Regions:
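Active-site core of glycosidic bond-cleaving carbohydrate-active enzymes
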Residues: 2-177
Length: 178
């Protein structure tokens, strides 16, 4: 569904650009908008691609690219709205246990798009609490346990306390930029 959303965003932008400069849009761009589906979906919501359901909430939310960043999904259609609702419910049900740091602020955006401001704000606070180090640097691995298992030292099954996992040191080398 990511590629479908990207193709639609590109086609729409090319059509719009052509009109703005007084050109006729390429028929291929119009054909993409006419015949290419916006996404693939089943009863569970938007799928990763045709035949592949979203079965594990991991480090990216690309199956929802039609919501963000491409903004190609129109909520005014009741069937589409139901699909988005099922997608959101399924994504929420899967949880954040396999998420990495950079996808947490990204998750704030779909919450914003559907009007769930408290969840959007929570994601930003969660990112700050669990995925930034004491110097406020963003991390891939969780800095504090309890939200995700994406942590060096714990993914191998060894439970660690804060500061105990390998690679948790904070250092700066002269001449190196952050």
């Amino acid at each position: 569904s990511f590629q479908l959303a990207a193709a639609h965003r590109l086609a729409r932008d090319l059509i719009d650009a052509a009109k703005r400069i007084g050109e006729v849009p390429d028929p291929m761009w119009l054909d993409v908008e006419k015949r290419l589906p916006l996404y693939t979906a089943d009863y569970s919501g938007i799928m990763l691609f045709k035949g592949q359901r979203f079965v594990e909430s991991h480090r990216h939310h690309s199956h929802m690219a039609g919501l963000y960043p491409f903004d190609t999904i129109d909520f005014s259609d009741p069937k589409t709205l139901r699909t988005v609702e099922m997608t959101y419910r399924n994504w929420t049900r899967m949880g954040m246990g396999l998420w990495s740091g950079w996808c947490v602020p990204w998750a704030s955006i779909p919450h914003t798009h559907i009007g769930n401001a408290p969840a959007a704000v929570f994601m930003l606070h969660a990112w700050d609490t669990f995925f930034t180090n004491p110097g406020y640097g963003s991390r891939h691995d969780v800095y504090n346990q309890g939200l995700s298992i994406m942590r060096r030292g714990t993914n191998s099954g060894r439970f660690t306390v804060a500061g105990d996992a390998p690679g948790e040191e904070i250092m700066q080398m002269d001449g190196m930029c952050a």
